[in-house]
Amino acid sequence: MASRSLASISRSASRLLQSNVQKCALPAASIRLSSNNVESKKGIHTGVATQQAAAATKVSAKATAANASGRIVAVIGAVVDVQFDENLPPILNGLEVVGRSPRLILEVSQHLGDNVVRCIAMDGTEGLVRGQPVADTGDPIKIPVGPETLGRIMNVIGEPIDERGPIASKNFAAIHAEAPEFVEMSVEQEILVTGIKVVDLLAPYAKGGKIGLFGGAGVGKTVLIMELINNVAKAHGGYSVFAGVGERTREGNDLYHEMIEGGVIDLKGKNSKVSLVYGQMNEPPGARARVCLTGLTVAEYFRDQEGQDVLLFIDNIFRFTQAGSEVSALLGRIPSAVGYQPTLATDMGSMQERITTTKKGSITSVQAIYVPADDLTDPAPATTFAHLDATTVLSRGIAELAIYPAVDPLDSTSRIMDPNVVGQNHYDIARGVQKILQDYKSLQDIIAILGMDELSEEDKLTVSRARKIQRFLSQPFQVAEVFTGHQGKFVSLEETIRGFTMILKGELDHLPEVAFYMQGGIDDVFKKAEELAKQHGN
């Protein structure tokens, strides 16, 4: 009985509650109805006003988003977590820590939830505290671009670090950009003539190609880079960009002063041919992971806006990968093989795909590559190799013979060494030169044990021509005139092919091999031979 009475009480209470709700709802419904009638009387004017108000709200929301401010909630090494009350900044936006000198820029990398974004710091995070205010800049990191950057050194965020005042550029560009569309790309394969005989003949560079430069310390890598910068400027009127990624500060400083001495950088006038972007070894991983993109952005401006053939040097591309792996671990990503970031191929691909030839101009990239423990199967160099069009190998053995540039003619390769691209004559001469050098290499053991006298007449001729070719592959550089005392030479591709054709045909067998050393074209060899003949005649 008690349960039935309780049930009846519950039902009556429920009916009473529903009737009260309906009574309360009636006035609200009538209010909504009357307001709708009023709005319908106002007509089209109210609709327009509503649209304008909505548009104004959107604009104000955008403005608020651009100037959104947050506060630091966590600092984990080079990674900083920032919380925003509203209007989260998008991925890759730049944030600036308020009231900090020098400026500290953070780049948004992840959205964590609870209005928290995880950022990568572009400078040291020493002294940061929780609660410190952070402002959204409203854009990705932007840097100055254009002719004003020539002869200057800047860091990853575009600030000058050469103590020569601000960079007075009117143009700025974001360091993150899409690769050119397929329709914008040039399909023609064309040689970028460097004026360096051994490169142009045996491992030519393609316009818009990527070249791996392998070389240890002291084999002439820096001098080769400077000569390439100088020759591209003179032959093509093009500019160069040098990105020092994870460089030793001392080496970066030495390169800068050598460029001033070599005339590549003009401190007094406006004849500088190169822009420098440095993210040294002591910089945090965020800066080293992005300085590549800063240099590439400077090069893209010259290609897209000025139609230039730009040369982009990256030293060292391995440090780009290394910095990415450091950042990846701090961001909480699960590492892949050998501890590298799981996004290794994506990071490398998104950067390398921007280096290409378009219908406006080209970016040709020369990338120094460090191979960890000489293991070519390591994921970092292996990922880089997939993007290369040519390899230029500098050999210590050739440098010990005082043959500069010390490029190994047998190890260096190029994808465009193809008769359909370089022409049948060029291809045949290059392969003929390599065959003679390979034959000479295989005869060296016999020569070392038995001597030259035990060789056949044919082998003696091969050795004689190979030694002339080896010496003719040397060349005086314009930027090295102060070291060598020889006047630098720029040798055209036609002149290079003519010279080696004459050697292969035996037309120069009567000339002494010393006449071929440190000469430009074949005409210089004839002059040297005449001088030697006069000296011996006297």
Curated annotation (Swiss-Prot):
Give the UniProt entry's GO cellular component terms.
Answer: cilium; mitochondrial inner membrane; mitochondrion; non-motile cilium; proton-transporting ATP synthase complex
Q: Could you tell me which SUPFAM superfamilies the record lists for this protein?
A: C-terminal domain of alpha and beta subunits of F1 ATP synthase (SSF47917), N-terminal domain of alpha and beta subunits of F1 ATP synthase (SSF50615), P-loop containing nucleoside triphosphate hydrolases (SSF52540)
Report the top EC class in one word. Answer: translocase
| A Pfam short name | ATP-synt_VA_C
| GO molecular function list | ATP binding; ATP hydrolysis activity; protein domain specific binding; proton-transporting ATP synthase activity, rotational mechanism
Cellular compartments annotated: Cell projection, Cilium; Mitochondrion; Mitochondrion inner membrane
UniProt main location, coarse: other
**Transmembrane spans:** none
Where ATP is bound, by residue?
A: 215-222
**EC number(s) on file:** 7.1.2.2
Q: Which UniProt keywords apply?
A: ATP synthesis, ATP-binding, Behavior, Cell projection, CF(1), Cilium, Hydrogen ion transport, Ion transport, Membrane, Mitochondrion, Mitochondrion inner membrane, Nucleotide-binding, Transit peptide, Translocase, Transport
Q: How does it assemble?
A: Subunit of the F-type ATPase which has 2 components, CF(1) - the catalytic core - and CF(0) - the membrane proton channel. Interacts (via N-terminus) with lov-1 (via PLAT domain).
Which PANTHER family does this UniProt record tie to the protein? ATP SYNTHASE, ATP SYNTHASE SUBUNIT BETA, MITOCHONDRIAL
The protein, known as? ATP synthase subunit beta, mitochondrial
Q: Where does this protein come from, organism-wise?
A: Caenorhabditis elegans
| Upper lineage | Eukaryota, Metazoa, Ecdysozoa, Nematoda, Chromadorea
Q: Which gene encodes it?
A: atp-2
